[in-house]
């Protein structure tokens, strides 16, 4: 795979619903692309075309119906993510791959500060250092200091998303998946996030993301993959 970090081959995801009769529909079919080390790869396309479902398959939140996702892991070598044992998937998520979803799901009792520091602590960074780095990241993303000890469940949509981003990027994962990370952000916050993502790319991280802002796509992307809605 040389400098290819992710290779997607003939990927398909279908859903089956019973309403009450069985109905089958495809989120996407026959998806093929390579993702190169250090690349910023954007996915664009109309709403409902299956973009978010694709990212969920890449992260193994969803299991695919057909096809392969070959991932070059620093721990396991080249593996087919669609066939990998669950424990190995969890290890890769903890040590190599991060994901910014559209929605932040957290345990109510956990503060924003501890939530953002947790990935560093998991990687054996001393707790005190992890907390300080989390404070710096939250401040950089304009989260008020008086909210650090509060649960993100009480935050606005934009604040929740910035905490979500902070948690995903603070440990500089090898591969970062982004599902519309700037959709709920104002222009100022979007510019800050853009700078963080560009810095990550320069430091060697590989990024694949869904964006609807065409100007932003043109500014940050090395390549753009156009999704078409399945009929």
Question: What residues fall within each predicted segment?
Answer:
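ABC ATPase C-loop
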Residues: 168-169
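Short coil-to-helix segment of the ABC ATPase nucleotide-binding domain corresponding to the Q-loop/switch region
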Residues: 110-118
């Amino acid at each position: 795979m040389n400098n290819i970090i992710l290779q997607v081959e003939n990927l398909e995801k279908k859903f089956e619903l019973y309403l009450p009769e069985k109905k089958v529909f495809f989120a996407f079919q026959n998806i093929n692309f390579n993702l190169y080390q250090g690349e910023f790869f954007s996915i664009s396309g109309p709403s409902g075309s299956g973009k978010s479902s694709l990212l969920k398959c890449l992260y193994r939140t969803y299991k695919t119906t057909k096809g392969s996702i070959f991932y070059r892991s620093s721990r396991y070598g080249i593996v087919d993510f669609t066939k990998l044992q669950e424990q190995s998937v969890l290890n890769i998520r903890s040590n190599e791959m991060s994901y910014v979803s559209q929605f932040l799901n957290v345990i109510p009792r956990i503060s924003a500060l501890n939530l953002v520091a947790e990935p560093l602590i998991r990687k054996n960074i001393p707790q005190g250092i992890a907390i300080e780095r989390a404070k710096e990241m939250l401040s950089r993303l304009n989260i008020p200091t008086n909210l650090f000890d509060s649960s993100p469940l009480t935050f606005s949509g934009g604040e929740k998303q910035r905490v979500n981003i902070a948690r995903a990027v603070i440990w500089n994962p090898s591969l970062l998946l982004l599902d519309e990370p700037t959709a709920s952000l104002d222009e100022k916050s979007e510019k800050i996030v853009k700078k963080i993502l560009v810095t990550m790319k320069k430091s060697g991280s590989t990024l694949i993301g869904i964006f609807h802002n065409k100007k932003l796509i043109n500014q940050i992307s090395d390549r753009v993959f156009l999704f078409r809605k399945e009929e």
